[in-house]
Amino acid sequence: MRLSILILSLLFLILPAKAQPKHEVRAAWITAVYGLDWPRTRATTPQGIRKQKEELVDILDKLKAANFNTVLFQTRTRGDVLYPSSIEPFNSILTGKSGGNPGYDPLAFAIEECHKRGMECHAWMVTIPLGNRKHVASLGNRSVTKRMKDICVPYKNEYFLNPGHPGTKEYLMKLVREVVSGYDVDGVHFDYLRYPENAPLFPDKYDFRRYNKGRTLDQWRRDNISEIVRYIYKGVKAMK
């Protein structure tokens, strides 16, 4: 055992420098859902706004001290966002009310504070899930389920964007374009870009019959996810 450890140690020592990564990503998520990481204070008063900002700064200071260099800041949750958007409403975690304006731009603030500390800030966006019926109802007429019913489907008491509908990739690209064009983000991080777990009865039969082009259901669904990634990647690269 000692000999093996010694040999491994020597191998690491003689590996060429070029084998080392040029940039090691040491990333952490800052989760806004239910205020799991942030925020704990509601931004309903000047004092509340200041406290909410201080909470985020404290997290960033701790990450910097722990030698992290990348922050994945939750920018979209489930059909709502943490920046002033012309497409979707503010998440209720900021003020206690869906669509409530916190009086500042959380994403812009997060980017500025990350860059002050020499850290990258990536926009972390939950993509396909839209939340349960209660959550969707709380968003009112600004919910995508009300504005663009064709690309949304209910499944097991929740709503989802339909990956098999061509309009879904267009809608997600619109959101990503809003973020990439309006903010100095260092990257975009997609979450839940997939079908729900154990979803043999996911209601996409109509789209499958229309768009499958001879593929099996499983292959068609896999291709739908790949196409969304491909489409948005190309769109972002065309911008930056």
PLM region spans:
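Catalytic domains of carbohydrate-active enzymes, especially glycoside hydrolases
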Residues: 51-80, 182-185
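Polysaccharide-binding and catalytic clefts of secreted carbohydrate-active enzymes
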Residues: 68-69, 105-108, 117, 140-240
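Bacterial N-terminal signal peptides
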Residues: 4-13
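Aromatic-lined carbohydrate-binding/catalytic grooves of carbohydrate-active enzymes
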Residues: 66-102
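Active-site-adjacent "subsite" loops/lids of carbohydrate-active enzymes
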Residues: 23, 31-54, 112, 122-182
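Boundary at the C-terminal end of the N-terminal hydrophobic targeting segment
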Residues: 17-21
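Aromatic- and glycine-enriched glycan-recognition loops and surfaces
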Residues: 45-66, 93-117, 223-234
